[in-house]
């Protein structure tokens, strides 16, 4: 052992020197002294301590010093568990790897030693020493060799695993390493078949899990609340479960299942379906090995449900195989006992109900399953329809059909099918014996319902797969569980069923197929019925007895209570005081203990924090110093390593680098290395392409040849398959016919057997009728009395009901008569109104005709006035033209000849309207014809507008027309007919009489004179031109300029609003509201070019005139227009404003 303290580097050199001279113990002591020295253990980084630790562990493995290795590992963990976890992980993995390598080497050495001993003397294989050793210890040579050579290393490896698990159990940074080591320990137990070590390992892991579930204040503690920790623990327990099943340690497997269920319940996240499927599969296997068929079937059913719901790519064959497995496991469950409470007199441990409840929790079931509930769930999930026909028949034969004579034969056929196909039904073979037992029990129960006694010989014929000893055992078990009443007569070799009528079979109806109840069941129900009847009779005979007894008992109880109430009250108070004192004492003790523990934990944590802080400061200073020293060297080597490493990551780069040594790599730069890499890559690519082409050709030829050779084989296979299918169908059909014949014979025999019971049935019915005759007569009398009372009651009700119906009918007739009279009055009123309306219509027509005649007279006068005015205009125009020519001649006297310009000729002597007279006669005649047609259309439609004209009677009175005539023709002399814009070029200068078709007035002009109807006013240029009454003077492009022939009218001061426009001046109805001009019927006079009515009716005064010479109006006329517009704001016009 070293006598002085030395640095870690020197200690490692000295240890190597001791190893070279063959003193490993001295080397181990030297390295151990370094770890024990508190001065150096935290002063160096992992780069210095890690090689020393590897050497230390190597010596411990060589010398098998597991306790010394444990001490060093704990010291190393304390140094680097918060600084460099990877270093700690590397050290532990390296330690375990060395231990495993030495153990495997020892195993190989042990096998080699046995082989040498066996081949030592071929002539004398069994030596006297080997014979004596085998007789004394019972071991062979391999076992003895393993005990001397292999066992010490196995023990060392086991201790190494335990030390590492104990080392890492509370470190959250090494949690993954902890679970990896646990799996390595499981593999160790499997490899060397160490069952006792496996049990201790399971207990150790369970203890660690309990420790981490408790609260911990350590900074490196593992928390079970983290999802990662829960998942790691769950994976480890699943691995433990697999290992326990492989080693057939079913008790440990069951404990692992409990741990897995606890972890899944603790986890906030739902386990993945794959984990749940693995869990149910292993749980079913454990229940099967434990002989618990009920929970085994329940686990398989849960697995079937999970797989069916979540596995999307489940094939039909897999589903059928799983369904058959579940159905057969469910049907193999032994029939339950009729009185399971008898088991509690036999069980020494917990009651069966508590055990079943605990197992049900593992399956996630609210209550323990039963055979009946599982079969009901299987039927609900449609499992019998998913399996093949033979298993579907198996379910029907055991649970549905009642056929004891053929039951065992049918089940034997299913058993033979399962045993014949061992490869396909490997999972179903373990259920054969259980299925046979269930079949025998079904047979015995069905036989007991048909026969009172049966011989052993006959019963053995019905159950071919059971001998007499097994049958007798099953009969005794049935009686033991009180399932059935059976008596065995060995003298006569017979069995008697249900002979004891004083004892019932069970408290409820037996499950499965049932033909009839046992005699004991009938006796049991008879007694219950008798008790009910007697109780009712006693209550009728003595109605007050029970009430008196209850009152007496209540009085006694009250008296007894008053006697003992004070004593009981004091006793309860005293007991309560004792309990309170005990609680206070326990609470004080708990508080004191908790305060002491908290104080101790606080002191320990404070010391640990101070030590940790000091160590971290020292390590930080040491790392900072080394970092500055290593940065310069690292920068130099970094660039070259990165280039080489980048190239070495590819296969062609590795091949290229393998051709160069280190000196050659150092001589090359990055570009040269990249160039060589590219050359190598191109060469490999060419080689690969050539290989692929040759391979493609080879595969193509081979595939074609193979398919050609397969054709005759396929044809032969199809021919053989057709023959086999036909033979199979014929055999199946023959079997079906035979079964149908057998069933027919069985039904006929059954009918013949039951016919013998007809006389007994008839005798029983006659006797029963004679007994019940008196009771029938008495009930008949009561029924007649009740019938008479009910008849009287219903007759009275019918009288009241009919009286009410007659009253309702009278009221309905009276109401209908009133309604009829009101209808007659209404029809008479409507007829009167129609007659009055017709009289008003005729009156309006007469008035319209009178007004028309007046309008025609007025129109003739206006035409005469217009003609005179037109002649005055022409005369004035000629005078103006003569005056203008004279002035021009006087002006040309002094103007030079070069400046004289030919002036445009003045208007023709005929005046402004001369061109209207000279218009083409065809156009004038066409417009005259159109005016006549419009006039006729207006007269035809006049009847439809009588109502509207009637409201304008007050504006159409003759007095107003006469007043207008007295005013002179100058007032309306400006109303010259204007043509639409489309006709300006042809008839714009035509006289009003000429445009209207000569002197005959048109119907359109008549309507314009009296205002016309709404549709006539809307059909002209008022709507097309969007003219509004408040607009200023129109532009030339809208209506044209002021016409020259309009000037005289404007000078006279006449206003166009003074013209007779009765309908438009008062645009109101008789009720005082304005008419909706735009809402009138269809527009009339729609002919012509512009839709405003051509010919006589097309010359509406709103139509825009043709272009003419523009001349500004006088100021007086503009002022007069403003006055007219101002006065028109509330007048007749209904033209929209802009």
From Swiss-Prot:
<dbReference type="GO" id="GO:0016282">
    <property type="term" value="C:eukaryotic 43S preinitiation complex"/>
</dbReference>
<dbReference type="GO" id="GO:0033290">
    <property type="term" value="C:eukaryotic 48S preinitiation complex"/>
</dbReference>
<dbReference type="GO" id="GO:0071540">
    <property type="term" value="C:eukaryotic translation initiation factor 3 complex, eIF3e"/>
</dbReference>
<dbReference type="GO" id="GO:0071541">
    <property type="term" value="C:eukaryotic translation initiation factor 3 complex, eIF3m"/>
</dbReference>
<keyword id="KW-0648">Protein biosynthesis</keyword>
<dbReference type="GO" id="GO:0003743">
    <property type="term" value="F:translation initiation factor activity"/>
</dbReference>
<dbReference type="GO" id="GO:0043614">
    <property type="term" value="C:multi-eIF complex"/>
</dbReference>
<feature type="compositionally biased region" description="Basic and acidic residues">
    <location>
        <begin position="817"/>
        <end position="903"/>
    </location>
</feature>
<feature type="domain" description="PCI">
    <location>
        <begin position="319"/>
        <end position="502"/>
    </location>
</feature>
<dbReference type="GO" id="GO:0005852">
    <property type="term" value="C:eukaryotic translation initiation factor 3 complex"/>
</dbReference>
<feature type="compositionally biased region" description="Basic and acidic residues">
    <location>
        <begin position="1003"/>
        <end position="1049"/>
    </location>
</feature>
<feature type="compositionally biased region" description="Basic and acidic residues">
    <location>
        <begin position="923"/>
        <end position="967"/>
    </location>
</feature>
<dbReference type="GO" id="GO:0001732">
    <property type="term" value="P:formation of cytoplasmic translation initiation complex"/>
</dbReference>
<feature type="region of interest" description="Disordered">
    <location>
        <begin position="817"/>
        <end position="1138"/>
    </location>
</feature>
<dbReference type="InterPro" id="IPR027512">
    <property type="entry name" value="EIF3A"/>
</dbReference>
<dbReference type="GO" id="GO:0006446">
    <property type="term" value="P:regulation of translational initiation"/>
</dbReference>
<comment type="function">
    <text>RNA-binding component of the eukaryotic translation initiation factor 3 (eIF-3) complex, which is involved in protein synthesis of a specialized repertoire of mRNAs and, together with other initiation factors, stimulates binding of mRNA and methionyl-tRNAi to the 40S ribosome. The eIF-3 complex specifically targets and initiates translation of a subset of mRNAs involved in cell proliferation.</text>
</comment>
<comment type="subunit">
    <text>Component of the eukaryotic translation initiation factor 3 (eIF-3) complex. The eIF-3 complex interacts with pix.</text>
</comment>
<keyword id="KW-0396">Initiation factor</keyword>
<protein>
    <recommendedName>
        <fullName>Eukaryotic translation initiation factor 3 subunit A</fullName>
    </recommendedName>
</protein>
<comment type="similarity">
    <text>Belongs to the eIF-3 subunit A family.</text>
</comment>
<dbReference type="InterPro" id="IPR000717">
    <property type="entry name" value="PCI_dom"/>
</dbReference>
<keyword id="KW-0694">RNA-binding</keyword>
<dbReference type="Pfam" id="PF01399">
    <property type="entry name" value="PCI"/>
</dbReference>
<feature type="compositionally biased region" description="Gly residues">
    <location>
        <begin position="1082"/>
        <end position="1100"/>
    </location>
</feature>
<dbReference type="InterPro" id="IPR054711">
    <property type="entry name" value="eIF3a_PCI_TPR-like"/>
</dbReference>
<dbReference type="Pfam" id="PF22591">
    <property type="entry name" value="eIF3a_PCI_TPR-like"/>
</dbReference>
<keyword id="KW-0963">Cytoplasm</keyword>
<feature type="region of interest" description="Disordered">
    <location>
        <begin position="590"/>
        <end position="633"/>
    </location>
</feature>
<feature type="compositionally biased region" description="Basic and acidic residues">
    <location>
        <begin position="1107"/>
        <end position="1128"/>
    </location>
</feature>
<dbReference type="GO" id="GO:0002188">
    <property type="term" value="P:translation reinitiation"/>
</dbReference>
<dbReference type="GO" id="GO:0003729">
    <property type="term" value="F:mRNA binding"/>
</dbReference>
<feature type="compositionally biased region" description="Basic and acidic residues">
    <location>
        <begin position="1058"/>
        <end position="1078"/>
    </location>
</feature>
């Amino acid at each position: 052992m070293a006598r002085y303290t030395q640095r870690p580097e020197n200690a490692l050199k000295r240890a190597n020197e001791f190893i070279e001279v063959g003193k490993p113990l001295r080397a181990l002591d030297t390295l151990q002294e370094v770890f024990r020295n508190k001065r150096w253990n935290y002063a160096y980084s992992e780069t210095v301590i890690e090689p020393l630790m590897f050497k230390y562990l190597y010596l411990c493995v060589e010398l098998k010093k597991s306790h010394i290795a444990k001490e060093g590992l704990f010291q190393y963990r304390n140094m680097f568990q918060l600084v460099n976890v990877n270093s700690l992980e590397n050290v532990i993995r390296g330690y375990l790897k060395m231990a495993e390598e030495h153990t495997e080497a020892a195993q190989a050495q042990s096998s080699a030693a046995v082989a040498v001993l066996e081949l030592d003397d071929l002539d004398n294989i069994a030596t006297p020493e080997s014979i004596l050793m085998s007789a004394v210890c019972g071991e062979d040579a391999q076992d003895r060799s393993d005990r001397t050579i292999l066992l010490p290393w196995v023990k060392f490896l086991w201790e190494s695993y335990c030390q590492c698990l104990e080392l890492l159990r509370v470190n959250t940074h090494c949690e993954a390493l902890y679970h990896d080591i646990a799996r390595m320990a499981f593999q160790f137990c499997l490899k060397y078949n160490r069952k006792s070590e496996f049990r201790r390992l399971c207990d150790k892991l369970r203890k660690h899990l309990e420790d981490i579930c408790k609260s911990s204040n350590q900074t490196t503690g593992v928390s079970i609340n983290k999802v990662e920790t829960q998942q790691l623990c769950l994976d480890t327990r699943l691995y433990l479960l697999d290992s326990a099943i492989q080693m057939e340690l079913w008790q440990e497997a069951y404990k692992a299942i409990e741990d897995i269920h606890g972890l899944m319940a603790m986890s906030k996240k739902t386990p993945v379906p794959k984990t749940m499927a693995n869990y149910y599969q292993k749980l079913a296997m454990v229940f099967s090995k434990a002989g618990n068929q009920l929970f085994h079937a329940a686990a398989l059913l849960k697995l079937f449900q999970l797989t069916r719901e979540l596995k999307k790519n489940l094939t039909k064959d897999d589903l059928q195989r799983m369904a058959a497995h579940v159905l057969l496991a469910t049907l193999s469950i032994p029939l339950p006992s009729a009185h399971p409470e008898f088991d509690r007199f036999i069980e020494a441990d917990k009651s069966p109900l508590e055990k079943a409840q605990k197992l049900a929790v593992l399956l996630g079931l609210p209550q323990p399953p039963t055979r009946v509930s599982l079969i009901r769930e299987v039927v609900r999930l449609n499992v019998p329809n998913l399996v093949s026909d033979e298993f579907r028949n198996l379910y029907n034969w055991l649970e549905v059909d009642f056929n004891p004579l053929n039951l065992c034969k049918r089940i034997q056929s299913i058993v033979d099918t399962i045993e014949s196909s061992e490869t396909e039904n490997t999972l179903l073979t373990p259920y054969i014996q259980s299925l046979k037992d269930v079949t025998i029990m079904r047979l015995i129960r069905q036989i007991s319902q048909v026969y009172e006694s049966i011989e052993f010989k006959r019963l053995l014929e019905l159950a071919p797969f059971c001998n007499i000893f097994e049958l007798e055992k099953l009969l005794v078990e049935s009686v033991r569980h009180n399932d059935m009443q059976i008596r065995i007569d060995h003298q006569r070799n017979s069995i008697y069923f249900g002979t004891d009528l004083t004892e019932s079979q069970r408290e409820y109806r037996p499950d499965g197929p049932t033909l009839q109840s046992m005699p004991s069941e009938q006796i049991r129900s008879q007694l219950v019925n008798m008790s009910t009847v007697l109780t009712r009779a006693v209550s009728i005979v003595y109605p007050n007895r029970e009430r008196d007894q209850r009152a007496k008992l209540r009085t006694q109880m009250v008296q007894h209570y008053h006697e003992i109430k004070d004593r009981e009250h004091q006793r309860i108070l005293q007991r309560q005081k004792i309990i309170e004192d005990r609680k206070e004492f326990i609470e004080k003790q708990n508080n004191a203990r908790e305060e002491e523990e908290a104080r101790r934990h606080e002191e320990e944590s404070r010391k640990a924090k101070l030590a940790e802080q000091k160590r971290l400061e020292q390590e930080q200073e040491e790392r900072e110093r080394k970092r500055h020293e290593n940065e310069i060297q690292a920068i130099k080597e970094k660039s070259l390593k990165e280039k080489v490493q980048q190239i070495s990551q590819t296969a062609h780069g590795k091949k290229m680098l393998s051709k160069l040594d280190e000196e050659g790599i150092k001589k090359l730069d990055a570009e040269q290395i990249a160039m060589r890499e590219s050359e190598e890559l191109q060469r490999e690519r060419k080689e690969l392409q050539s290989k692929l082409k040759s391979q493609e050709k080879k595969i193509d030829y081979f595939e074609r040849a193979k398919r050609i050779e397969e054709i005759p084989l396929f044809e032969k296979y199809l021919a053989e398959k057709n023959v086999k299918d036909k033979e199979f169908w014929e055999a199946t059909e023959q079997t079906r016919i035979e079964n149908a014949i057998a069933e027919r014979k069985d039904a006929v025999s059954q009918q013949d057997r039951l016919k013998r019971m007809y006389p007994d049935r008839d005798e029983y019915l006659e006797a029963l009728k004679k007994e019940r005759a008196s009771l029938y007569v008495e009930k008949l009398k009561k029924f007649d009395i009740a019938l008479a009372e009910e008849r009287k009651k219903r007759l009275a009700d019918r009288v009241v009901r009919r009286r009410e119906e007659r009253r309702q009918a009278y009221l309905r007739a009276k109401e209908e008569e009133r309604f009829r009279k009101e209808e007659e009055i209404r029809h008479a009123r409507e007829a009167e109104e129609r007659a009055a309306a017709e009289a008003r219509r005729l009156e309006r027509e007469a008035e319209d005709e009178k007004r028309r005649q007046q309008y025609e007279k007025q129109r003739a006068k206006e035409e005469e006035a217009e003609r005179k005015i037109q002649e005055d205009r022409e005369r004035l125009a000629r005078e103006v033209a003569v005056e203008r020519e004279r002035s021009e001649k006087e002006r040309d006297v002094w103007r030079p000849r070069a400046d004289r310009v030919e002036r445009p000729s003045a208007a023709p002597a005929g005046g402004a309207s001369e061109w209207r007279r000279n218009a083409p006669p065809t156009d004038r005649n066409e417009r005259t014809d159109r005016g006549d047609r419009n006039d006729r259309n207006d007269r035809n439609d006049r009847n439809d507008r009588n109502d509207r004209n009637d409201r304008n009677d007050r504006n159409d009175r003759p007095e107003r027309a006469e007043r207008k005539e007295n005013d002179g023709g100058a007032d309306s002399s400006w109303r010259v007919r204007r043509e639409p814009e489309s006709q300006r070029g042809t008839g714009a200068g035509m006289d009003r009489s000429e445009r209207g078709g000569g002197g005959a007035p048109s119907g359109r002009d008549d309507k314009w004179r009296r205002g016309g109807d709404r549709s006539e006013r809307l059909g002209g240029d008022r709507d097309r031109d969007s003219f509004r009454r408040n607009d200023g003077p129109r532009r030339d492009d809208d209506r044209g300029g002021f016409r020259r022939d309009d000037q005289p009218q404007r000078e006279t001061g006449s206003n166009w609003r003074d013209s007779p426009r009765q309908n438009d001046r008062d645009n109101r109805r008789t009720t005082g509201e304005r008419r909706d001009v735009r809402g009138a019927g269809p527009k009339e006079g729609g002919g012509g070019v512009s839709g405003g009515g051509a010919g006589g009716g097309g010359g509406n005064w709103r139509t825009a005139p043709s272009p003419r010479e523009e001349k500004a109006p006088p100021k007086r006329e503009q002022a007069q227009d403003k006055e007219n517009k101002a006065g028109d704001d509330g007048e007749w016009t209904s033209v929209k404003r802009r």
